[in-house]
Amino acid sequence: LVELRLPRAILGALVGFSLGLSGAAMQGLLRNPLAEPGVVGISSAAAFGSVLALYSGLSASAALALPLGGIAGAVLATILLFVLLGRGAGTTTLILAGVALNAFAGAATSLALNLAPNPYAALEIVFWLMGSLADRSLAHVLLVLPLMLAGWALMLSTAPALDALTLGEDTAASLGFDLAWLRARLIGGTALAVGSAVAVTGAIGFVGLVVPHLLRPLVGNRPGRLLLVSGFGGAILVLLADTALRLAPIRPELKLGVVTALIGAPFLFSLVNRMRREA
């Protein structure tokens, strides 16, 4: 229980909180309800870093090589993102830089799959990319916990500025908020939280997109108040999804990323249908 179940539950809660919080933060920053943590390219870069650890064989020789590779990928992508953006970049530049990072990391991951030495190596990479909490230990929790806590602190500190940003960038600036510093804190916080989450679990989609949508009616048009609520909502969603796949009579065990996508996709279809009726 202590060696397997407890670390898995703790890690699931940490990852879910990171994804939910980051999703709300990105939607608040970009003022777009369709934004999600992967929009800045950090999660794709973290996934590529872990894929490199798998491809090179480092993951077989060192237990923590896989998450460390993901964290290294996230750190390098964050540095590159700040270099590309500079001090005075706006929201459009941020999105374009994120698209470029996503495209490059995705292409590099596909290249690693294409050049895999054998089908088993390619299959290992594909299965890891699907996302899972299986076989994670307390060492994984201790590795990412400080990074996640730092990321959460950065994002939660932006709550007043995000509320002001709903009035427009000019109004927020006139109220005394430094928009460049706001973007830096949100990008840095997302990089720390989501990068470390992807590094230990693989890609788990839809949590950062769906959870803020579900919980936004509870707080109204206040993105700052949505941050903490979405974090807890993300933690609950990931824990419920992981519990469901463990109890499902299917072997081998389903991947967590598959389950969250199966939960998230119907919700998005219903959201599209509701928006179509309201239009």
Predicted regions mapped to residue ranges:
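Alpha-helical transmembrane segments in inner-membrane proteins
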Residues: L1-A279
